[in-house]
A protein has these predicted regions:
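Hydrophobic alpha-helical transmembrane segments of multi-pass inner membrane proteins, especially
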Residues: 2-169
Length: 169
């Protein structure tokens, strides 16, 4: 059957993506703004359900299988997080130079990120780090991205350096 071949599956997903793109373009943006919180919470529920109802594919227990179709909620969680973060930052009262607003923005990003890391899907979780650029552009003090980048450098260095060298230092 055509669908069982790799090319067939790709064509089905290209067609599905095209339909989804048209739907997104036709729907008024206020719909997404109005339902951003519900979309986000729904995806959080899916991320919570993955360890219990999901299947393991390529060593990652972060997939749902429906017949021959598999989906990864982490991919949709990125979009849901972007929607809710955009809605939050659109509020004229939000000031990212003040700690309470920084804390709320960090929680919006951190909750799905931690759930995804718990599903052994570190690559998808790292994509959430790119939200730091958005927050910096929207007024987050520069010390936060600097500390974040420093932490990443320290983490990667710790992976590359032998443990006994770290103990000597």
């Amino acid at each position: 059957a055509f669908y069982n071949s790799n090319a067939g599956k790709q064509l089905v997903w290209i067609g599905t993506s095209f339909v989804l793109i048209v739907c997104i373009l036709v729907i008024d943006f206020r719909f997404f703004e109005s339902f951003a919180l519900f979309i986000y919470l729904g995806l959080l529920l899916l991320l919570i359900a993955v360890p219990f109802l999901g299947v393991t594919i390529n060593g990652s227990h972060s997939w749902f299988k429906f017949g021959s179709v598999t989906i990864q909620p982490a991919e949709f969680a990125k979009t849901a997080t972007a929607l809710l973060l955009g809605k939050y930052l659109n509020d004229p009262l939000v000031n990212l130079t003040k700690f309470p607003f920084q804390w709320k923005a960090a929680l919006i990003i951190a909750i799905p990120m931690l759930l995804i890391i718990g599903s052994n899907e570190t690559g998808s979780a790292l994509v959430f780090a790119s939200f730091m650029i958005l927050l910096y552009r929207e007024g987050l003090p520069g010390a936060y991205p600097a500390l974040f980048i420093g932490g990443i450098i320290l983490f990667v260095s710790a992976l590359l350096v032998k443990a006994w060298i770290i103990l000597l230092v």
